[in-house]
Amino acid sequence: MNKNIEQFPRKTTLTPQQKLEQLMEQHKTVHLTELFDKEQDRFAKYCVGCEDLVFDFSKQRINQPILDALVQLAESKQLNKWIDTLFSQNKINYTEQREAMHWALRLPADNQVYPELAKQVSDQLERMYQLVNKIHEGQYRGATGEVIQDVVNIGVGGSDLGPLMVSHALSDFKVKTAKPLNIRFVSTMDGSQLSDILHQLRPETTLFIVSSKSFSTIDTLSNAHTARKWLEKALGRESSILKSHFIGVSTKPDKMTEWGIHPDNQFLLWDWVGGRYSLWSCIGLPIALTIGVEGFKAFLAGAHGIDEHFRTTEFHQNIPVLMGLMGIWNTNYLNLKTHAVLPYDGRLKYFTSYLQQLEMESNGKSTQRNGQKVENTTCPIVWGEVGPNAQHAFYQLLHQGTQKVSCDFIAPMHRYNANHFTYVENADALIDQHLLALSNCLAQSRLLAFGNDALKVDQREQLPAYKQYEGNQPSTTMLLKELSPRTMGKLIALYEHKVFVQSVIWDINPFDQWGVEKGKEIANDLLPILNGESSDLSHLDDSTQGLIQFLLGKSNG
């Protein structure tokens, strides 16, 4: 054989990460305007529907090769296997040796795959439903025999953010009750919320829900203690006071009993439910009190529908997978450090706050499952506001600032056209306002994407620099047919599973939160100094010592 025959170079097989790095180098300066010019059918290619919602990611800075490479990345990380593990009874939360089975909270009661699990959950929910109906029918009475008309949910984190967010979002679906019923929320440990609320309430007609997974959270127990003192001062210290005016939700029945909550008023959840995933359980009692039993069942059914979509749908059409992969592309390859969530519906006022916990407490990690430091940036900073209000706050930065930001736009397609609407006599004018919000939602996503090219030709001519729009800010748009218990359940479940997808890519555990633990321990060490039980500051840094001296009035500053 002729040794001088030129050898063809061997074809190098790139890993998905290498392929994405290569694609990033090729496309990092490509503008969304150019992507839309090259692909006239982007909406058809990069939009996925799932019954009564639409997920449009055509304004993301991707093309088909990038999308394919992202899917290959997910496959290389064995995402399918991890999804199967999630929907099992395996201890996927390895640092706490617990399952993560929030999906089980929305299983149909007659589920045949996990019949015992479904029954366990159903038994607690049925007890909750009985309480809800009793309160709605005016049959739940306080210690003096008066009907309960005010319910105060005391919790923090997952025991507060989720129930508050959903109760507010679904206010149009508030059920009629025999007597007017108000649901209020208290979370801050400083007592300011509770102080504002208590003077508006009558002890005789007030019921407190104390929600704490561990029933040891100091924020919650301090508020509960104050509420208890308020009741006892007005009604006395008989055991009937606690029995009639306190409900407990926790994994710890013994601690609830020790605190004074009667076993009949204790509702249980399980260690395999993370706090930020717990609103589907009896932690969601305030939601059920707002939208009723049938509304809560529709809420669970919507989430279960997304569980099935996530579990069974091919990745190119799988909305939570696509949501997660768009975030991976933006964070790890386009180097975007923050992500804004912009709902164009005032009812979603608390949705961003809820997502901040869901995303940043889950994926704000820097240690891989093998104990090594992560190789890539993990969770971006999540922020945002109701879109129309945000337009008058920080959209200036989005449009003309120096920060690159990815955005989620969320809006219902229809509103003010159903029997649940409270102010029917004003429906025509309010429908016009809804259309105004939708037009602004579409306009802002368009301007963020295309910049000056979104303007009319005559508007672009001779624009001074301070009126220029660069564009190329990536976004997705989620349209819901309407904001209802069912679609609200779907929306939350989509983001839950998006978070899980990203945790698999980053190889981190999204179900623990060790970063929040030590701060609470240090606070417990400092409290005796502030209340005068200890005076030893020697173990503290100079800054903390100085601040304590100021607080105690001992500083010469």
Swiss-Prot record:
Disulfide bonds: none annotated. It catalyses: alpha-D-glucose 6-phosphate = beta-D-fructose 6-phosphate. Keywords: Cytoplasm, Gluconeogenesis, Glycolysis, Isomerase. The active site is at E361 (proton donor), H392, K520. Its EC number is 5.3.1.9. PROSITE patterns: P_GLUCOSE_ISOMERASE_1, P_GLUCOSE_ISOMERASE_2, P_GLUCOSE_ISOMERASE_3. GO terms for cellular component: cytosol. It is an enzyme of class 5 (isomerase). GO terms for molecular function: carbohydrate derivative binding; glucose-6-phosphate isomerase activity; monosaccharide binding. Pathway: Carbohydrate biosynthesis; gluconeogenesis; Carbohydrate degradation; glycolysis; D-glyceraldehyde 3-phosphate and glycerone phosphate from D-glucose: step 2/4. SUPFAM superfamilies: SIS domain (SSF53697). CDD domains: SIS_PGI_1, SIS_PGI_2. It is found in: Cytoplasm. It comes from the Bacteria. One of its GO terms (biological process) is glucose 6-phosphate metabolic process. Pfam families: PGI (PF00342). Its main location: cytoplasm. Belongs to the GPI family. Catalyzes the reversible isomerization of glucose-6-phosphate to fructose-6-phosphate. This is Glucose-6-phosphate isomerase. It comes from Acinetobacter baylyi (strain ATCC 33305 / BD413 / ADP1). The gene is pgi.
